[in-house]
Regions:
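Conserved "landmark" site that anchors the functional core of diverse proteins
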Residues: 1-288
């Protein structure tokens, strides 16, 4: 049983359902997918006392417009796109309101959770959309989004007026240095190259997406530009022939043939996901 909640007036630059991703399918070539910014998605659900794995609506950058079909409690987190409702707190949206995200100020990915959770089609155990693999698709204008009609008859105690503490609301314009675990081909890179990687700022390019974030900076020169293809995990820092790193993201291939200098710590990958094209990031090694 579901309840119609939003009419998509405009999906903006992209709108999909995402959750914590699908597990156990990598050996079949299916990436985990899931929310690009797990930190923001988690807080959207947590504010409403939803299960942390409940589907959320992931919006890209700006431009989305949603007509509210009935009164609903919701939470908006993630990128700042000048939403016309308060963010990082629970909000009671009224029927006939239009939720808008007109202009991006910082960050890339926006998250909306609704009390009880969205109803999303589960494919291979997850509601996360993986468009390249045709597991679900992005929403288009005119579609209706529904929530699960659960057993709750009143809002859980303490949810109304709840907000995220200031220390957990991230300033996406100023990311910290991202921590890196050593990669399996770290020895392909000279000490000079490692010092160059960790000592230089790297610029996120406009070719970055859910598959991978491409960085540009001083060219690295691994001793071998290709290896026999092997499993690749989300967050791997691959260095192709041009010497410009690519960080694999939630929809990345599950195998690859480029040497891997390291892997971004999972807790820091959400920071990278929210870096806009042109933004600079730095990395620091995790000492083992």
């Amino acid at each position: 049983m579901s309840v119609a909640l939003f009419n998509v007036l405009h999906p903006g630059l992209g709108a999909t359902f995402q959750d914590q991703g699908r597990r156990g399918w990598r050996r079949f070539g299916v990436p985990p997918s899931g929310a690009m910014d797990e930190h923001a998605a988690m807080w959207a659900n947590r504010l409403l006392d939803n299960p942390l794995g409940a589907p959320v609506l992931e919006l890209l950058f700006q431009g989305a417009k949603l007509a509210v079909l009935r009164d609903a409690w919701l939470a908006i987190t993630g990128a700042d796109a000048q939403a016309n409702l308060p963010t990082w707190r629970t909000v009671h949206a009224k029927a006939d309101e239009v939720i808008q995200f007109p202009k991006n100020r910082s960050g890339v990915w926006i998250y909306i959770a609704v009390e009880g959770g969205f109803e999303g089609e589960r494919l291979l155990g997850s509601a996360s959309v993986y468009q390249r693999g045709r597991l679900g698709r992005g929403f288009v204008s005119g579609e209706v989004l529904s929530k699960i009609s659960g057993a709750r008859y009143e809002l859980p105690r303490g949810v109304a007026g709840r907000s995220v503490i200031a220390s957990e609301r991230r300033d996406y314009a100023s990311p910290p240095s991202l921590r890196i675990w050593p990669g399996p081909q770290l020895n392909f890179f000279t000490e000079a190259d490692r010092a160059l990687f960790f000592g230089s700022p790297w610029t996120v390019t406009s070719q970055s997406d859910r598959v991978g974030y491409r960085l540009v900076g001083p060219a690295l020169k691994p001793s071998s530009a290709q290896i026999i293809s092997e499993p690749v995990r989300v967050g791997s820092v691959q260095v192709p022939e041009n010497g410009q790193p690519i960080v694999t993201m939630r929809d990345s291939p599950t195998i690859g043939g480029y040497p891997k200098l390291g892997m971004v710590a999972p807790a820091d990958l959400s920071w990278l996901a929210q870096c806009r094209p042109g933004q600079k990031v730095r990395f620091q090694p995790i000492e083992t």
